[in-house]
Amino acid sequence: MSEIGLVKIYSGKVRDLYEIDDKRMLMVASDRLSAFDVILDDPIPSKGEILTQISNFWFKKLAHIMPNHFTGQTVYDVLPENEAKVLEKRAVVAKKLTPVKVEAIVRGYLAGSGWKDYQKTGSVCGIRLPEGMQEAQQLPEVIFTPSTKAAVGDHDENISFEECGRIIGKELAEEVRAKAVRLYTEAAEYAKSRGIIICDTKFEFGLDTNGTLTLMDEVLTPDSSRFWPADQYKVGTNPPSFDKQFVRDWLEQSGWNKKAPAPKVPADVIQKTVEKYREALTLLTQD
């Protein structure tokens, strides 16, 4: 990624943050891909641009539910034109917020770590589910399964709702749960009408200077969610997906021990991943 004339204040798995002033920052989505909490050496071309477009679409679509990190400004308001041109599709001028110290994970279907948990315990993150459920089955109701926010390279850990309340306070935990479930429910209904099932997703929240809960980071992208094509969805299977699951599945069968460094991902797997991200963007946003 090209250098810009702002000070970098944070480098995450996928996004880099640059300081504009004490109230605003520039959030830039790179083409980096992380899987199993390891950043892979091979970037996914255009991924940052596609993710930013999907995220921006959802931020606007769900703005009636709660405030978000948008400032209403563009990169051209904060960068010289030559720098803004390079980054305009992958950067957002965002409010500086105090992050809420939990990941807000919402699940509508039984898959991934939730399915593994259910097979062992009959529950997902301590939430009891009916007996005899199958992989990829829709849950009787949407569930909120928070996790801790780990540093880059560490694993997030699932926690109970009670533990979530201990970390961020009971009242805030209840607000986070209610908002996360509402965001997911509304988005899942819309996505289904466009041929995408949103199996599960992760929201990030922050507090502004007045203590108002605000949606931030990225929203309902193939990186923060499991998207399934509705026409290929079948209970009792692990449906194909529009996201990095494609890379994850390849890594799972590669024999890798899930510690850095990751093996080199074949070019065709990268190409198919780009196509999947692009397809998700098209389905969701094209009229």
Swiss-Prot record:
Pathway as given in its UniProt record: Purine metabolism; IMP biosynthesis via de novo pathway; 5-amino-1-(5-phospho-D-ribosyl)imidazole-4-carboxamide from 5-amino-1-(5-phospho-D-ribosyl)imidazole-4-carboxylate: step 1/2
Keywords: ATP-binding, Ligase, Nucleotide-binding, Purine biosynthesis
PROSITE patterns for this protein: SAICAR_SYNTHETASE_1 (PS01057), SAICAR_SYNTHETASE_2 (PS01058)
Reactions listed under catalytic activity: 5-amino-1-(5-phospho-D-ribosyl)imidazole-4-carboxylate + L-aspartate + ATP = (2S)-2-[5-amino-1-(5-phospho-beta-D-ribosyl)imidazole-4-carboxamido]succinate + ADP + phosphate + 2 H(+)
Domain of life: Bacteria
EC numbers: 6.3.2.6
GO-annotated molecular function: ATP binding; phosphoribosylaminoimidazolesuccinocarboxamide synthase activity
Record Pfam families: SAICAR_synt
GO biological process, one term: 'de novo' IMP biosynthetic process
GO annotation, cellular component aspect: cytoplasm
Record family assignment: Belongs to the SAICAR synthetase family.
Protein name per UniProt: Phosphoribosylaminoimidazole-succinocarboxamide synthase
Gene: purC
